[in-house]
């Protein structure tokens, strides 16, 4: 079923302290006396599945499933151009920003935050007011010479960022009880997913249109061509429902095979398993971006990875109620597509030296089972190597969006778990 939710925002401790509310949410404000949330999520991804179950005898099973899913995954948010930041908790609007420079303003803002709810939420009416008095003419609009569009150019809009998936896959598992003490399972799967990343104008907030240009490139470069998000339609005028900003697909394909052998003895059970996988992912750009005109549109280079994994484990029965369990595994896996690309919204370029992650893991535990009480104590350890750490943020000194990536990141998780 479709899911629509309003999202809470993350604020700094100063905001929570001033409001006296640890659940303070900066994402909403009053419009015409009614609450409106700028951060809404929209999720609707139906799935269709066909399964076949084959059991030729009591010791054999062969199950196969074919599935298809598609849908919408969107999240709305405010965007603005040549205008003040509309977020009430923007750090320059907080009292602490003026603590050492303007004592009177510092005290006034503290009082406003404590007593005036409107001062700490989005001012929707002000956004509509700003958009309604910004008459602007776009010359050669949409790349058509002599085409002039005149109207109120929105300084603020509500946009929806989308990541709409289409996924098709098949899974097949064959299971055979070889005898009273041995069991074999083998299987394979194939998955293909294409995710469409783009954004649309959800609400012009009282304006007539939005001009589809990169505001950071527009500020940093004198060449207006560089600031065009769509070089095939320069000076693109967009209205409600139109796609703008970025528009591309990420395709992923995975072929996997696996097997597991299990053996039982009187006081012990053990298993070994292995898997092989071949994966590939690539980008397809739908627009030619002004920053990277030769590396943004069309099908990009495929990134291929071959991976494998092995595992083993067992249980030793000390008595009928006390057990020792141990497991160990090694596997390699391809990097996630959301961290593999440098700036997928505007170009087809992956991080230099991209390679598979390696995962080592193991655990050993003691298990006790009584009729009314069950308990477990487990020591675990895992090490993940060659990860990619990726973050995007606005840099105040550089006055631009920064894509920050680190490669070769290792991570260790270890600890003790107790459960009763």
Give the positions of each predicted feature.
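Signature of Gram-negative outer-membrane beta-barrel scaffolds
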Residues: 157, 183-319
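Residues on the lipid-exposed face of transmembrane beta-strands in outer-membrane beta-barrel proteins
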Residues: 48-54, 64, 170-176, 186, ...
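Acidic/polar loop-and-plug regions of large Gram-negative outer-membrane beta-barrel proteins
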Residues: 2-51, 74-159, 223-238
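Flexible, surface-exposed loop regions and adjacent strand-edge segments
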Residues: 2-23, 79-90, 94, 200-211, ...
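Transmembrane beta-strands of outer-membrane beta-barrel pores
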Residues: 68-72, 190-196, 265-267, 276-282, ...
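Transmembrane beta-strands of outer-membrane beta-barrel proteins
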Residues: 1, 62-66, 184-188, 270-274, ...
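Outer membrane beta-barrel strand-and-loop segments of large Gram-negative receptors
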Residues: 167-171, 351-355, 361, 370, ...
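Extracellular loop and loop/strand-boundary signature of outer-membrane beta-barrel proteins
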Residues: 33-38, 47-51, 155-160, 173, ...
């Amino acid at each position: 079923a479709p899911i629509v939710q309003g999202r809470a925002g993350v604020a700094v401790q100063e905001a929570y302290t001033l409001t006296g509310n640890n659940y303070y949410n900066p994402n909403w404000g009053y419009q015409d006396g009614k609450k409106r949330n700028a951060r809404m999520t929209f999720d609707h991804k139906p799935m269709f599945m066909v399964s076949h179950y084959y059991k030729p005898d009591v010791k054999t099973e062969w199950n196969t499933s074919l599935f298809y899913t598609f849908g919408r995954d969107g999240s709305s948010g405010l965007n603005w151009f040549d205008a003040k930041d509309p977020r009430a908790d923007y750090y320059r609007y907080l009292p602490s920003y003026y603590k050492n420079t303007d004592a009177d303003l510092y005290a006034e803002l503290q009082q406003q935050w404590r007593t005036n709810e409107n001062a700490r939420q989005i001012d929707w009416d002000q956004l509509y007011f700003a958009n309604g008095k910004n008459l602007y003419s776009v010359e050669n609009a949409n790349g058509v010479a002599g085409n002039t569009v005149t109207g109120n150019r929105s300084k603020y809009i509500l946009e929806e960022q989308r990541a709409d998936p289409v996924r098709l896959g098949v899974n097949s598992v064959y299971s055979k009880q070889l005898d009273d003490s041995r069991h074999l399972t083998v299987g394979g799967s194939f998955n293909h997913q294409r995710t469409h990343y783009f954004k649309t104008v959800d609400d012009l907030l009282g304006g007539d249109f939005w001009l589809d240009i990169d505001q950071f490139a527009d500020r940093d470069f004198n060449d207006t061509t560089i600031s065009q998000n769509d070089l095939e339609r320069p000076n693109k005028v967009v209205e409600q429902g139109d796609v703008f900003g970025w528009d591309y697909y990420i395709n992923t394909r995975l072929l996997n095979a696996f097997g597991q052998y299990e053996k039982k003895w009187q006081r012990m059970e053990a298993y070994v398993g292995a898997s092989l996988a071949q994966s590939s992912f690539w980008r397809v750009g739908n627009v030619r971006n002004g920053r990277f005109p030769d590396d943004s549109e069309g099908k990009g280079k495929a990134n291929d990875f071959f991976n494998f994994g092995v595992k083993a484990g067992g249980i030793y029965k000390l008595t009928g109620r006390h057990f020792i369990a141990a497991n160990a595994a090694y596997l390699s896996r391809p990097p996630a597509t959301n961290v593999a690309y440098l700036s997928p919204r505007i170009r087809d370029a992956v991080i230099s030296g991209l390679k598979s992650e390696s995962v080592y893991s193991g655990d050993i535990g003691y298990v006790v089972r009584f009729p009314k009480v069950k308990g477990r104590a487990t020591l675990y350890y895992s090490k993940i190597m060659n990860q990619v750490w990726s973050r995007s943020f606005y840099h105040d000194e550089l006055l631009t969006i920064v894509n920050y990536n680190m490669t070769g990141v290792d991570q260790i998780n270890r600890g003790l778990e107790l459960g009763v």
